[in-house]
Amino acid sequence: MEFKDCFNELKKDFVNKDVSNVPNVVFEFNVKDVGVFYAKVQDGKLDIQPYNYYDNDVSFTAKFEIYKKIINGELDPIKSFFTGRLKVSGDLGKAALLQSILK
């Protein structure tokens, strides 16, 4: 799958998530063998862009299929981390915010 298609599909799934009560945070998503995008929550609004965000709070690395299942609620991100399907670097406290966004 090409990056543009991957990004658009994940963005479509992500864009309607409620972030009104989520503190400011920047997640960077490295999609293995495809590319990188970020999701930035600021002042209760979500911005998703197809670029690196070098000053991110937390960075995730996984295959496209894993992200798709996590975003759609089919796979728990914390369990994915502990089973090695999802790699996390950066602020683990802020990484946990991802789960609150996806609920």
Language model region names:
Residues 1-103:
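Feature captures hydrophobic
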